[in-house]
Amino acid sequence: MSQAQPLLVRMMNTNIVIQILIGIIAGVALATLAPNLAISAGLFGELFVSALKAVAPILVFILVAASIANQKRGQNSNMKPVIVLYLVGTFCASLTAVVMSFLFPTTLTLVIDAATNTAPEGIVEVINTLLFKIIDNPINALMTGNFIGILGWAVALGLGLHSASDATKKIFVDLSNCISAIVTVVIRFAPIGIFGLVSHTFAETGFAVLAGYSHLLAVLLGSMAFIALIVNPLIVYIRTRRNPYPLVFLCLRESGVTAFFTRSSAANIPVNMALCERLNLHKDTYSVSIPLGATINMAGAAITITVLTLAAVNTAGVEVDLATALLLSLVAAVSACGASGVAGGSLLLIPLACSLFGISNDIAMQVVAIGFIIGVVQDSAETALNSSTDVLFTTAACRKADNPYKPLVQPTN
């Protein structure tokens, strides 16, 4: 026992990214050697994702309310530059996807059953859904994980608490510290959770089904990689005039890896919050910008909508001029910002974009169905890009405001 305990302590003290990599390797090995057992191990992944999703709504609500309630008058929260970075990044992603689709055009064989979910009829419906989510019942918003509604009520409560006594404000600060401590414990189980997710995915789905869509996946993943490694660093450099790559790789490693396997921006909010705290960012900023980013910062979704829409266009033999392609970029960017307000996310916004080219809903929904088939990779990569960019742009805005000469990466531990 005396020998086992130090080993356990050493394992717990190992960098969590290394632990996650070990979990990934172990998951692949288990799925290869014992597929049935690997499917059962998926329980660990489901528990981990459920725990993250359970703690995320209350974490966002308490942190945002406490942050706004305790904000001093005239204090700069850096939210405006963060939002600008979110919108610019999403539009650049959509433009990149258009260029990649023109350089490497994709056609599809539409011989599968159409997806059965109902897609939104237009951009007005998407905006309408988002507006109604803002005024959702606060209890229902917390229960259903409606982060737009949670943000709205948390901001309203925080503003209302401006005139409260210091003792009342202190209660919310203490509550936010308690919730943050719970999140820290949940995140420590990430290696086990990701082990379960990888085991289940490899054992149940495999990647043989993806071979037929290799070109489509290459365009999607290539576009996302270009945004993550070229465009986003360029945006950060223009904003800060400092080397962006240490921060880029940190965000991809510590936020993107977890998001890739959880496939949920909402579930990754606690992970991003913890990373922002390690980077010593302003709590007033990241407590709002991270959950907001999970809602509107959707570079990956913009790429998915654009690439699959142009694949449908190529398949239907429709000619696309430059003006229409630019319009598609704008529609995809705006639609992507509303992806969190649509059941099925970015995929079910594809028919909306296809309507620009007169493509029938039947064909568009078959493209959506292909999206679900490749979702094991597409959705994972999309979420990793979306979620890691939340931390990237939040850090860039905070560092620019703090000191323009300090390096971007300054973790406290």
Curated annotation (Swiss-Prot):
Q: Does the keyword Membrane feature in the UniProt annotation?
A: yes
UniProt superkingdom? Bacteria
Molecular function GO labels: neutral L-amino acid:sodium symporter activity
Which ranges does the record mark as transmembrane?
15-35, 48-68, 82-102, 141-161, 178-198, 216-236, 290-310, 330-350, 357-377
Q: Print the keywords alphabetically.
A: Amino-acid transport, Cell inner membrane, Cell membrane, Membrane, Symport, Transmembrane, Transmembrane helix, Transport
The protein's topology relative to the membrane is: Multi-pass membrane protein
Listed HAMAP family:
Ser_Thr_transp_SstT (MF_01582)
What family does this belong to?
Answer: Belongs to the dicarboxylate/amino acid:cation symporter (DAACS) (TC 2.A.23) family.
Please state what the protein is called. Serine/threonine transporter SstT
